[in-house]
Swiss-Prot record:
Keywords: Nucleus, Transcription, Transcription regulation. Belongs to the GeBP family. One of its GO terms (biological process) is regulation of DNA-templated transcription. It comes from Arabidopsis thaliana. InterPro entries: GEBP, GeBP-like_DBD. It is found in: Nucleus. This is GLABROUS1 enhancer-binding protein-like 3. Residues 38-50 have a biased composition (Low complexity). Transmembrane segments: none annotated. Residues 36-57, 167-191 are annotated as: Disordered.
Amino acid sequence: MVGTKRVADSIDTNSDDTLTRNREVEVEAMLSRRKQLRTTTTRTTTTRTTPLSLSSSASKMNWSKNDELVILGGIVDYENETKLSYRSDWDALYRYIKDCVEAKFSKIQLINKVKNMKRKFTYNQGRSNHGEQLSFTNTDDDEIFKLSLIIWDKNESEYVSNENIDQAKDVPSGEPETNDVPCEEQDDRDVPCEEQERANIEIDNGVREKLDQAKDVPCVEQESEDVPCVEQERVSIEIDNGEKEKLDQTMDCEEQENTDVLCEEKGDKDVPCEEQENKDVPCEEQERVSIEIDNGEEEMSSEEDGVDEVGVMEDTLDSGISFQGLGKNGVKDKSEEDDVVELGVLQEIFKEDTFFQSLGRYQQKLLLQNLENVGVERRKELINEWKALFVDEQRLCVKKLTFAAKLANLGVSP
């Protein structure tokens, strides 16, 4: 009995061991199959999802307001520097802007962003054209709209040109009239000849046009024949006691020389000159021209004696520039006209500066608008300072011309 029990017990233990081993093998096989399934599924999912995730992340770009301002400002500066449209070469525009933005982006993202900003601008522009008042919650949106206006508004250039034309109309043009008109005709306009000459000094773009000083240099042929140029002496520039240049004469020095020499060679004035016979012009007509010149000199001398009576033009003797226009239908209010003229002069002086010309169009427009906020007193101080600089420049030019005349005389007369 005992032997049978032991055999049965051994059989039971062997069967239990085999069962446990079979279970362990099955568990290991199951785990291995699960691992294989997981690896295959992860591989397929990664191969399928990776391009989508990359494409979606590449297409998405969170642009800030600062980035938009940098892009628009870069477009404005790029067009100013290259004189080309930004649409002509996207690669060049991308290279020009990419280093200015902190975030990394591609050329396609830049193109899409510019197109979106243009759509937004056209929408806002349409609202404003239909009479809706545009109001922005922050200053960044306002700056973005202004930059977009500079880039995409077709009428912007016309608006700026019209603004400049209006400012030029406010500034007295004062083109110098020809001196061929006698002083008697100018007296009919109730304007003295001396005052009319001073008032007709031209201010072109805020900087007074330099007078033709080359005619102040004595004519070489005239000096060789010892014939004084009457018209040249009449309109010669006086520098003593702070008096500045007057308007240049319209009669050419050489023509005056020829007419005076020809008339002096003929003792009998009734006999026509030899060269004037070819032109069918009698010598008497030449005499009338010289008489008119003498009358003009006498009237100028009499008007120079009465300069003190002209109170309005008293200050312009030192500066050589008149900032008051003579209106055709009456004179406007003096204070308002002076303010407009001074503002226009300051803006045009600033435009001629090399630093201003090196800036972009948007920065130039902002600086010109800021000049309008300058006070009246400060504006007058700047005008007076510019007058002093201009007078110094004119004196230097006169000295240079005088020195050139001396060199010319030395070269002619050994």
